[in-house]
């Protein structure tokens, strides 16, 4: 029994210490640091808007994509909605999904005969990307302009206001935040 305790006591103590350090102390320190250094992002980047009745309400997060399907809105990437996002790019299932999404885009805007940008017909790995490429936003400018009765110049200006540059100036591609563009478009009515 003494030999058993000599073996198991350090293992149990080590397990408890590692659990405390990795499960409580480290996450606590990271949370405190994130809340202090990146308060808005650490709390979900919640966007609040003034409503017609004068109250302010939460409308969404700048970091989580929302589904927009009305033609007067900028529409983001396809949501995964229970569909696997890790499909083989050459699989029949992926091909059918993309064809279905292409047909949806053609039905939404039958006058647009340009090539549909890839990010509008494929889901992201997370399935909730808040951003689309500049090409995907540009593809939708004419439709939004027509549906809202505003100039394409106004739509392009709003898109430009909500376009983020490359990370550190060289990493990745510029992206357009879909929710922020749509909120700005809605504010034009006011």
Swiss-Prot record:
Q: What is its main location?
A: membrane
Q: Any idea which UniProt keywords this protein has? A: ATP-binding, Cell membrane, Ion transport, Membrane, Nucleotide-binding, Potassium, Potassium transport, Transmembrane, Transmembrane helix, Transport
The lineage's top-level taxon is Bacteria
- A Pfam entry, by short name: KdpC
The GO terms describing molecular function are: ATP binding; P-type potassium transmembrane transporter activity
Q: Name one GO cellular component term.
A: plasma membrane
Q: Is Secreted one of the keywords UniProt gives this record?
A: no
Which compartments is it annotated to reside in? Cell membrane
- Membrane topology classification: Single-pass membrane protein
Q: Which residues cross the membrane?
A: 13-33
HAMAP family in alphabetical order? KdpC
Supply the NCBIfam families for this chain: kdpC (TIGR00681)
Family listed: Belongs to the KdpC family.
Physiological role: Part of the high-affinity ATP-driven potassium transport (or Kdp) system, which catalyzes the hydrolysis of ATP coupled with the electrogenic transport of potassium into the cytoplasm. This subunit acts as a catalytic chaperone that increases the ATP-binding affinity of the ATP-hydrolyzing subunit KdpB by the formation of a transient KdpB/KdpC/ATP ternary complex.
Oligomer status and interactors: The system is composed of three essential subunits: KdpA, KdpB and KdpC.
- This chain's protein is named Potassium-transporting ATPase KdpC subunit
Provide the species name. Listeria monocytogenes serotype 4b (strain CLIP80459)
* Encoding gene per record: kdpC
């Amino acid at each position: 029994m003494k030999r058993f305790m000599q073996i198991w006591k350090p293992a149990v103590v080590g397990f408890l210490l590692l659990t405390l350090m990795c499960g409580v102390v480290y996450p606590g320190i990271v949370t405190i640091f994130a809340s202090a250094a990146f308060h808005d992002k650490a709390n979900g980047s919640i966007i609040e808007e003034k409503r017609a009745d004068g109250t302010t309400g939460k409308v969404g997060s700048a970091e989580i994509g929302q589904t927009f399907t009305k033609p007067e809105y900028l529409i983001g990437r396809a949501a995964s909605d229970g569909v696997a996002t890790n499909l083989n790019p050459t699989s029949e299932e992926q091909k059918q999904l993309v064809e279905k999404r292409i047909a949806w885009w053609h039905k939404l805007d039958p006058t647009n005969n340009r090539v549909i940008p890839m990010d509008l017909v494929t889901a992201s790995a997370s399935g909730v990307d808040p951003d689309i490429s500049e090409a995907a936003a540009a593809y939708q400018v004419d439709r939004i302009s027509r549906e809202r009765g505003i100039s394409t110049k106004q739509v392009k200006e709003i898109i430009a206001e909500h376009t983020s540059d490359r990370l550190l100036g060289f990493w990745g591609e510029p992206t357009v935040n879909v929710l922020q563009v749509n909120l700005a478009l809605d504010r034009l009515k006011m």
